[in-house]
Amino acid sequence: MPKLKTRRAAAKRFKLTGSGKKIARRKAFKNHLLNHKSAEQKRRRLSGMALVDKSDEKNVRLMLPYA
């Protein structure tokens, strides 16, 4: 059976947590149009990583067969 291909776009966007049980992602809305957003919003609410929702996790794992 041939090797499964990893979806490169997904590999760049998602990382496994240390235990390998959850998938982490960057938060949205912090790329451009940032002038009207408060520093507090950008620092607290938009910074850091978030976990992929349980309903989406199966699809992400299919895109990352070796993760």
Curated annotation (Swiss-Prot):
Q: Which GO terms describe its biological process?
A: translation
SUPFAM superfamilies the record matches: L35p-like
Q: What keywords is this UniProt entry annotated with?
A: Ribonucleoprotein, Ribosomal protein
Q: Which domain of life is it from?
A: Bacteria
In alphabetical order, the GO MF annotations are:
structural constituent of ribosome
Region forming the signal peptide: none
Pfam families linked = Ribosomal_L35p (PF01632)
Provide the Gene Ontology terms for cellular component.
cytosolic large ribosomal subunit
InterPro entries recorded: Ribosomal_bL35, Ribosomal_bL35-like, Ribosomal_bL35_CS, Ribosomal_bL35_sf
Q: Which family does it belong to?
A: Belongs to the bacterial ribosomal protein bL35 family.
Protein name stated in the entry: Large ribosomal subunit protein bL35
Q: Which organism is it from?
A: Picosynechococcus sp. (strain ATCC 27264 / PCC 7002 / PR-6) (Agmenellum quadruplicatum)
